[in-house]
Regions:
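Short, surface-exposed loop/turn motifs that are enriched in glycine and acidic residues
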Residues: 256, 273-276
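Acidic (Asp/Glu) and glycine-rich low-complexity loops/linkers
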Residues: 2-75, 79-160, 166-178, 184-196, ...
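Conserved mixed alpha/beta core segments that line enzyme active sites in large multi-domain catalysts
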Residues: 288
Length: 357
């Protein structure tokens, strides 16, 4: 007679609950231990300083000189400072910075940053390498602070992720690229290109050409621009100075322009507002928007051929011009000798004009 083995008895329910409870306690203890280690060694949570990391470490980088014509810098959250030198060599210096509960942990954090420097031909490559971090960690990450003094003949390219870039009296030409890092340039000269995703850009007293591309970062620029090109999605743009040619394109960002002198200017927005103050461009000035408003405050005397058109928006004109518009949706008129062409087009945005002494 064939025997059939009886199924084994399942583990009792109290035993299963006990095993699960013990496993949960072990996982909680591991998580708390990791949390306390990160908290004590770094001292911040989600970027909020709890003043627990009372020590930091700065490992200095000895100055090095290179005879090159181009510099390439790449990093993550690192800080890059470019300045001018009257010499013929690029000078590299800086430091690695780490943070922790005590000096030993801060030094260990700084050692997680490696600065790789290599000259290949006439190009200097500087790459900041970071040791991989845990997916979820707390505290301030270590970073490198690089300082490069550049001769005017050298070109540069700096690419960062969340790190900031600063340019001080740089006479060289080049490109700065960041994702969320900010860019500040002061007293610069030459051809400068800045590209960010969300990082803000501030340019003070630039002399030369400037090209800016950003998604949501704001731009504030002052200077004498031979060729100005700005492209944003929803970042606001504030400009002041002199322009040979200027072209600004944005979707929802507002554009504010103060002009002392210009030859040609074109501003395009989708629903961003345009505010213009100052002297009209000598040759051609064009402003086009769909739903954004256009506000013009122009210096007297007005010497221009004006062509204002709006589909459903309203026009606000000085009292002395009101009778010259047969159509409240458009105005075509020549004032003075008509040396400048001023063209403004909107779909639903309003157009307003004011003259000032």
């Amino acid at each position: 007679m064939k025997q059939t083995d009886l199924p084994s008895q399942p583990e009792s329910l109290p035993g299963q609950l006990l095993r699960r409870r013990l496993l949960g306690i072990v996982l909680i203890l591991i998580g708390l231990s990791w949390f306390l280690f990160e908290l004590l060694s770094r001292g911040t949570i989600a970027g909020i300083n709890l003043n627990l990391a009372s020590a930091d470490s700065a490992e200095s980088i000895s100055p090095q000189r290179f005879a090159v014509s181009r510099v390439e810098v790449t990093g993550i959250n690192d800080q890059v400072i470019l300045s001018r030198t009257t010499g013929e060599e690029v000078i590299l210096s800086g430091e690695r910075r780490g943070f922790g509960w005590a000096a030993q942990s801060a030094t260990a954090a700084a050692m997680q940053v490696t600065i790789e420097v290599e000259q290949r031909g006439d190009t200097l490559y500087v790459h900041v390498r970071h040791q991989p971090q845990m997916m979820w960690h707390f505290g301030r990450d270590p970073y490198a602070r690089l300082e490069l003094a550049l001769p005017s003949e050298v070109t540069f390219n700096v690419a960062l992720m969340s790190g900031d870039a600063t340019l001080q009296q740089v006479m060289a030409s080049g490109t700065i690229t960041t994702i969320s890092g900010d860019v500040i340039a002061s007293d610069t000269n030459g051809q400068l290109t800045i590209e960010t995703t969300s990082g803000d850009i501030e340019v003070r007293n630039h002399d030369g050409s400037l090209r800016v591309v950003t998604v949501s970062g704001d731009l504030e620029a002052v200077g004498q621009f031979t060729d100005l090109q700005v492209e944003t999605t929803d970042g606001d743009v504030v400009l002041r100075g002199k322009y040979t040619t200027a072209r600004i394109i944005t979707i929802s960002g507002d554009v504010t322009i103060a002009v002392d002198d210009a030859d040609q200017m074109r501003v395009e927005t989708t629903n961003g507002n345009i505010r213009f103050t100052g002297q009209l461009a000598r040759e051609m000035q064009e402003m086009v928007t769909i739903s954004g408003d256009v506000e013009l405050t122009i210096n007297k005397p007005l010497d221009a051929q004006i062509n204002f058109t709006t589909v459903s928006g309203r026009m606000r004109l000085p009292a002395q011009f009101a009778h010259q518009s047969a159509n409240t949706r458009s105005l075509t008129q020549t004032f003075g000798q008509g040396r400048t062409m001023l063209k403004v087009e909107t779909t639903s945005g309003d157009i307003s004009l004011r003259l000032r002494e």
